[in-house]
Amino acid sequence: MVIRRDVRGVPHVLGATDPDTAFGFAYAQAEDNWQLIEDAMPFYRGNSAVYSGMDGAVTDYLVKWLGLWETVHENYKWDLSPDTRAYVEAYADGLNFYAATHPDKVDESKLPVTAKDVVVGHMLRHLLFYGFDGVVREVNKAERQRDISTPSEAVAVPADAKEITLGGLPIGSNAFAIAPHFSEEGATRLAINSHQPTTGPVAWYEAHIQSKTGLNVMGGLFPGSPSISVGFTENIAWGATVNRPDLVDVYVLEVNPDNEYQYRLDGEWRDLERDEVDIKLTLWGFLPWTVSREVLASEHGPVSVSYTHLT
């Protein structure tokens, strides 16, 4: 495996196999963005509050309420192909190798990084990127924010669509392609103009990864991602924009008046799944504390108790 950097410092990683390349890809990212990657680990693991106190408790509860780690533990070997597992495991190994060779730059308490850390990080990042956290905040308000919808074929439109216009034209992230016959030199071009910050955990990081078994892609990603998020290969190029696709369904459950832990489904009262999660905190920077909270789930997914209904 070889890492070469061009005049702009962009890493070009060449490996014999895809896992070789993933190892080098992780190492190159760690060289440039170790602190960002390390700081994100507690967030994905649901133990941010150990390091940041009460500020991290809300996201820790979210991770545990969604059952992300239970999902990964149960399905890691079945939902991910052997090739994919080998790739993310090699990626985690690359991060750990960097940590082992730079002990003065790492926090040992957050190591080692595992392949499941990488997978859960990818899962949680995507949820937040399309606005799932906004839905969670909405259903936990004191009053219901919207009526129960009925089946419709209408296209979902963001509520603030009219506010994000300038001169009648939409503004924000965009991507556009130019076909060869519209280009003076006959080239195909793609402008990936997603509006991201220039620094921080969601600033684009550029890289090129290639293996001798077929992998060859260049583009941008967020630090800590095992794959290229926007970019191009020899045959295809793609971009992405930040938007609000309608990917979350919220159900209002009918609760048994005689048993608050039962809800109606298909004409029958069903028991809610009940569990208790522990959230570990460090208060005032030195005092360890553990808070226990009940989490509920129905056949539809995680349950939140709000405005006298279960959702």
Where are these regions (language model features)?
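Ser/Thr- (and often Asn-) enriched beta-sheet segments in non-cytosolic proteins
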Residues: 276-280, 288-294
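Substrate-recognition/specificity elements adjacent to catalytic centers across diverse enzyme folds
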Residues: 3-200, 212-214, 218-221, 227, ...
